From Swiss-Prot:
<keyword id="KW-0677">Repeat</keyword>
<dbReference type="InterPro" id="IPR047084">
    <property type="entry name" value="GFAT_N"/>
</dbReference>
<dbReference type="Pfam" id="PF01380">
    <property type="entry name" value="SIS"/>
</dbReference>
<feature type="active site" description="For Fru-6P isomerization activity">
    <location>
        <position position="605"/>
    </location>
</feature>
<feature type="domain" description="Glutamine amidotransferase type-2">
    <location>
        <begin position="2"/>
        <end position="218"/>
    </location>
</feature>
<dbReference type="InterPro" id="IPR035490">
    <property type="entry name" value="GlmS/FrlB_SIS"/>
</dbReference>
<keyword id="KW-0032">Aminotransferase</keyword>
<keyword id="KW-0963">Cytoplasm</keyword>
<dbReference type="GO" id="GO:0006047">
    <property type="term" value="P:UDP-N-acetylglucosamine metabolic process"/>
</dbReference>
<dbReference type="GO" id="GO:0004360">
    <property type="term" value="F:glutamine-fructose-6-phosphate transaminase (isomerizing) activity"/>
</dbReference>
<keyword id="KW-0808">Transferase</keyword>
<dbReference type="InterPro" id="IPR046348">
    <property type="entry name" value="SIS_dom_sf"/>
</dbReference>
<feature type="domain" description="SIS 2">
    <location>
        <begin position="459"/>
        <end position="600"/>
    </location>
</feature>
<feature type="domain" description="SIS 1">
    <location>
        <begin position="286"/>
        <end position="426"/>
    </location>
</feature>
<dbReference type="InterPro" id="IPR017932">
    <property type="entry name" value="GATase_2_dom"/>
</dbReference>
<dbReference type="Pfam" id="PF13522">
    <property type="entry name" value="GATase_6"/>
</dbReference>
<dbReference type="InterPro" id="IPR005855">
    <property type="entry name" value="GFAT"/>
</dbReference>
Length: 610
């Protein structure tokens, strides 16, 4: 949820560190800081509450020089947003940044206070700094001190430590919070996300759980949780160097909404032919595993959970395989029963979602036949720890409110469902061809849906002055309504809820009045007539109706109901298609409200703490 950048080089690194933080702004933060030391042990630390630009201005004014440094953007967990709580934190000659949550920080704080340490901040991070300083007194090296400290920490952390007396060395420890090392020539870097380093290197080494690494200009030494030196593979990244550029768009979210046709094409490339899904493209051993699957368990959070809820309808109606979907933070704390031949599927844009990772690790101990992830970031923890991965190829997603990651997850899941049904002879060749043709048509249809931008923008003022909004859908369009309500909440700060339309009589009707906009997703399918009855229930109680309706659905607009007529598309891919106008509506409402669309308050892009 926070951002870390570090560098050991012969050149001055302050500008590299600040630029790295700029590239991580999308993750969400409330303060930022940097610390740099030069070869003569001259040391500078600068922290600022607010945006990275304020830190950058301060660094430029101070003429910060030095070849070794660390930088951080903080998203407050322990302690309010303030300059004193901002990272880096200091203890003696030790300077440190940290992502994660130290669960035993209170007992460690008490212990350290008894040893005479004085705390300046409210953070759990300062505990780590003092611990390292204490252990260094009896250790032969900074590496050893960090290793000893790591054994005392409970919780999640990715931490980078610098000793101003050793100005050409950084030590990093990882447990539950991602750290990637960027490998250069005569210089090395590290970050919590490779995006921070794409302007300085394309070669990356991903640390595993429990790793501690020592980094100098010319050497990277990695030690596992047992303290044994190990080799970690270096991979070449093909991620977009200019992912942090909005181009012609006002916001990253807007850019990413309009990138969805291309993202879908990329996700489907090489995975579908003219009339079939290429099962082997889903992952290593996919054919063998899918032949045996009797049940699917999906685990996810947030938008990814909504994608899983949509896919459940496909798994059961198309592939004939039972499917359960659970929120990761709930799944891991209940006593669940593992069904025979059950395939575990995790969904995550970042591949680093803390609760999803923890649920995966728990589930792997409980007898699932295999663990698959649908993910957007190659080399992420979920990808490395799963048996096989189906990458979504959406490209870097900067906006906190997920858009193209959601629709590409849905496309990937639909291909998976089709492959599963085909392998088990539950989907005929004719049905497979119908699904594939619908997928082929989808990018052009999404382009068409994006052309409704101006029409949807005209609706936004009707929502911007309201305090609540209700979204309705039936069947597989209920999760789409849930996702729509989440988007409106995230970026416009309007309270929004979604209900399966058949539940109106069981409570939500009590909320309906002239101040409650009700958005309805209305494709032409078997549930249309029942949905029309639900719409009439809202109309009869004076609700403000906004119906996104298939052109064949037969709705007629009047003073109480606005109709946005959508071209007819395949029932199979319609949930993906109807997502687009929901995204556009939320975006335009947020513009009127004047909120921070790309970095909504209190939210972070990658939730790497529990």
């Amino acid at each position: 949820m926070c951002g870390i950048v570090g560098a050991v080089a012969q050149r001055d690194v302050a500008e590299i560190l600040v630029e790295g933080l700029r590239r991580l702004e999308y993750r969400g933060y409330d303060s930022a800081g940097v610390a740099v030391v030069d070869a003569e042990h001259n040391y500078t630390r600068i922290r600022r509450l607010g945006k990275v630009k304020e830190l950058a201005d301060a660094v430029e004014t101070a003429h910060v020089v030095g070849g070794t440094g660390i930088a951080h953007t903080r998203w407050a967990t322990h302690g309010e947003p303030s300059e004193v709580n901002a990272h880096p934190h200091v203890s003696g000659d030790i300077t440190l940044v940290h992502n994660g949550i130290i669960e035993n920080h209170e007992s460690l704080r008490t212990l350290l206070q008894e040893r005479g340490y004085i705390f300046e901040s409210q953070t759990d991070t300062e505990v780590i700094a003092h611990l390292v300083e204490w252990e260094l007194r009896s250790s032969g090296s900074l590496l050893e001190a960090v290793q000893k400290t790591a054994t005392q920490l409970e919780g999640a952390y990715g931490t980078v430590v610098m000793d101003r007396r050793e100005p050409e060395r950084l030590v990093v420890a990882r447990s539950g919070s991602p750290i990637v090392i960027g490998c250069g020539v005569g210089e090395n870097f590290l970050a919590s996300d490779q995006l921070a380093l794409l302007n300085v290197t394309r070669r990356f080494m991903y640390l595993e759980e429990g790793d501690v690494a020592e980094i100098t200009r010319r050497e990277i030494r990695v030690f596992d949780a047992r303290g044994e030196q190990v080799e970690r593979a270096i991979t070449e990244s093909n991620a977009e160097h200019d992912a942090g550029d909005k181009g012609q768009y006002r916001h990253f979210m807007q850019k990413e909404v309009f990138e969805q046709p291309k993202a879908l094409i990329n996700t489907m490339e090489g995975r579908i032919t003219n009339d079939s899904v290429v099962t082997e493209s889903i992952g290593v051993n996919a054919v063998e595993i899918l032949n045996k699957v009797e049940h699917v368990q999906i685990i996810a959070c947030g938008t990814s959970y909504n994608a899983g809820m949509t896919a459940r309808y496909w798994f059961e109606s198309l592939a004939g395989v039972s499917c359960d979907v659970e929120i990761a933070s709930e799944f891991r704390y209940r006593k669940f029963v593992t069904r025979p031949n059950s395939l575990l599927i995790t969904l995550s844009q970042s591949g680093e979602t803390a609760d999803t990772l923890a649920a995966l690790r728990l589930a792997k101990e409980r007898g699932y036949m295999g663990a698959m992830t649908v993910c957007n970031v190659a080399g992420s923890s979920l990808v490395r720890e799963s048996d096989f991965a189906f990458m979504t190829r959406a490209g870097t997603e900067i906006g906190v409110a997920s858009t193209k990651a959601f629709t590409t997850q849905l496309a990937a899941l639909l291909m998976l469902v089709t492959a599963l049904g085909k392998q088990q002879n539950r989907i005929s060749k004719e049905k497979e061809k119908e699904i594939v043709e619908a997928l082929h048509a989808l990018p052009a249809q999404i382009e068409q849906a994006l052309s409704f931008d101006k029409e949807i923008e005209a609706l936004a003022p009707d929502f911007a002055d309201k305090h609540h909004t209700l979204f309705l859908g039936r069947g597989e369009f209920y999760p789409i309504a849930v996702e729509a309500s989440l988007k409106l909440k995230e970026i416009s700060y309007i309270h929004a809820e979604a209900y399966a339309a058949g539940e109106l009589k069981h409570g939500p009707l009590a909320l309906i009045d002239a101040e409650m906009p009700v958005v309805v997703v209305a494709p032409t399918n078997d549930l249309l007539e029942k949905l029309k009855s639900n719409v009439e229930e809202v109309r009869a109680r004076g609700g403000l109706l906004y119906v996104f309706a298939d052109e064949q659905a037969g709705f007629e607009a009047d003073e109480s109901m606005k109709i946005i007529t959508m071209p007819h598309v395949s029932d199979i891919t319609a949930p993906i298609y109807y997502t687009i106008p929901m995204q556009l509506l939320s975006y335009h409402v947020a513009l009127i409200k004047g909120t921070d669309v790309d970095q909504p308050r209190n939210l972070a892009k990658a939730v790497t703490v529990e």
